[in-house]
Amino acid sequence: MLTWETPVMLASNTASTKKLAFITTFLIIVLCPVTMVMSQPQADVLPLPASDADCLLRFKDTLVNASFISSWDPSISPCKRNSENWFGVLCVTGNVWGLQLEGMGLTGKLDLEPLAAIKNLRTLSFMNNKFNGSMPSVKNFGALKSLYLSNNRFTGEIPADAFDGMHHLKKLLLANNAFRGSIPSSLAYLPMLLELRLNGNQFHGEIPYFKQKDLKLASFENNDLEGPIPESLSNMDPVSFSGNKNLCGPPLSPCSSDSGSSPDLPSSPTEKNKNQSFFIIAIVLIVIGIILMIISLVVCILHTRRRKSLSAYPSAGQDRTEKYNYDQSTDKDKAADSVTSYTSRRGAVPDQNKLLFLQDDIQRFDLQDLLRASAEVLGSGSFGSSYKTGINSGQMLVVKRYKHMNNVGRDEFHEHMRRLGRLKHPNLLPIVAYYYRREEKLLIAEFMPNRSLASHLHANHSVDQPGLDWPTRLKIIQGVAKGLGYLFNELTTLTIPHGHLKSSNVVLDESFEPLLTDYALRPVMNSEQSHNLMISYKSPEYSLKGHLTKKTDVWCLGVLILELLTGRFPENYLSQGYDANMSLVTWVSNMVKEKKTGDVFDKEMTGKKNCKAEMLNLLKIGLSCCEEDEERRMEMRDAVEKIERLKEGEFDNDFASTTHNVFASRLIDDDDFGFAMNR
């Protein structure tokens, strides 16, 4: 057999050599013209790419008052893995991923060109500064995903083609500047745009036709816009179009007959250039297709020949296959054993063993550590289930499993988690790490020994386990107010910075210091589930008017105050929407009107003799925060200030005078505050 096989193989090799020579000649003939076209001289010498640090330092030189960022030291790298050495620089895997210089009083014109060479740059934020002049050029930032320029002093018209080529841009915030002229038509051609805020400017004319199907939020209020609202935006919140010259059509009132129809889809400013490029692109694609077909043919020939040569050795091939199958099954058995305890409680196992950490001061662990650890079910809330678990280091953690975030994209979710990871406040429970999978998300935080405020307010109490006394409750609500005030200052672009404030989302540490949880999750929640489950959507303004405002979180704070003072669970939280008949606010108001104010307070709440007036003050704040008309409702900053001013056993006459008018309608009178305080 060998004497016959050897000549056959040699002949085959000779034939293969001829075929490959023919294919090579053909490829040279086909590719030479393409190579000649693509190799036209672009520049005599290509400059060496600048480092990220060089780009940042050149950008710093363009700033008028850059003393705020003195930490930008040329001798130190801007990034160290996922942590930042330079203030305001955001890093991912050791590369500059973003720049966040917000609220620093920066002035002058904003020149972004020095940053264009940072290849991994994905987000820029210069909100709440004093930059002036025209809109900075962003045409060289094709990979940018988010641009935040709100609350500055930019002026002038934005060119129609200002955003051409920004095919990855998802979020653009230009609110509260002084831009004028028409809305740039190139915005309508950003394929991945999710959020657009143009409110608080001087744009005029008609709104262009936005054809993006995934556009979730578009804000045009307080401009000089007129004409019909494009049909593609008809499902937006009506508030997004308020304060304009003469806009009409859904979701606003219908247009009159002379208002014209919805504006046509605008022509792209670069459509002519694109058409000219289509012909060249088509030729290149055809050539590439031919090349791929040839390569595929060669691969098939070689693969067939290899199979024929291997068929002479069936026993060896069988041994290899059996060994592979054995190893694979063994690995599956090991994986199944390691996650049995987890799957029995949590369901499906995440398919990538990678946790992303947001805090640097915590010992690292991986997903397998969590899978192997025993866990205690803490509860099943509206968003998902919570588990208490401990890792090898002895640290106790809470793992929250969220099921209603599967509509958010991977990049958008990562960006929002990094934003939450930068929040630092004594009354916020920081997210230690998180895990992303499309079907579900895991958020990991430190376990708090005294659990939630709800467990203390609504659990069965005894002599050994009494209810919370008044000083502790005051301490808790003051901490909650401080945490909310911080969220309002840091998350200015969110309509509802918390969005899901309730007693079960306030946890207590070993000294009963409160920490807020589940904050700022609305941007990554599925729309349908957030409407049905989040506390903000049970507010009067959403049920009666169909919108949320900054004061929606104030309403949630007011209900929490009343829950803390009365010890009663807000039953309206169990129903969908707002039901005044089931509202805790209605019950408290009726008790006050009936001169039964003393019966409102939780009888298990002990305190000093002279704390009655202070408790009444907090009750007044709570009711003021719960005004059904949000225009009459207290501002968050005022509520935080008044709560912080409360001191045990003291009465503030100035505060009482400022709130007299608000509560006169509810017949609250200081003299009526008669009840037996437990001692």
UniProtKB/Swiss-Prot annotation:
Membrane spanning residue stretches: 278-298
Catalyzed chemical reaction(s): L-seryl-[protein] + ATP = O-phospho-L-seryl-[protein] + ADP + H(+); L-threonyl-[protein] + ATP = O-phospho-L-threonyl-[protein] + ADP + H(+)
Tissue occurrence: Expressed in pollen and/or in flowers, but not in leaves.
One GO CC term on file: membrane
Protein known as: Pollen receptor-like kinase 4
SUPFAM superfamilies, per the entry: L domain-like, Protein kinase-like (PK-like)
Residue positions where Phosphothreonine is found in the record: T472
Family: Belongs to the protein kinase superfamily. Ser/Thr protein kinase family.
Quaternary structure annotation from Swiss-Prot or TrEMBL: Interacts in vitro with ROPGEF1 (via PRONE domain). Interacts weakly with the GRI peptide.
Gene3D superfamilies named in the record: Phosphorylase Kinase, domain 1, Ribonuclease Inhibitor, Transferase(Phosphotransferase) domain 1
Organism for this UniProt entry: Arabidopsis thaliana (Mouse-ear cress)
One example of a Gene Ontology biological process annotation: regulation of pollen tube growth
Positions of LRR repeats: 118-141, 142-165, 167-191, 193-217, 234-257
Function: Receptor-like kinase involved in the control of pollen germination and pollen tube polar growth. Can phosphorylate ROPGEF1 in vitro.
In-chain residues carrying the UniProt-annotated modification Phosphoserine: S374, S452, S455
Sorted UniProt keywords: ATP-binding, Kinase, Leucine-rich repeat, Membrane, Nucleotide-binding, Phosphoprotein, Receptor, Repeat, Signal, Transferase, Transmembrane, Transmembrane helix
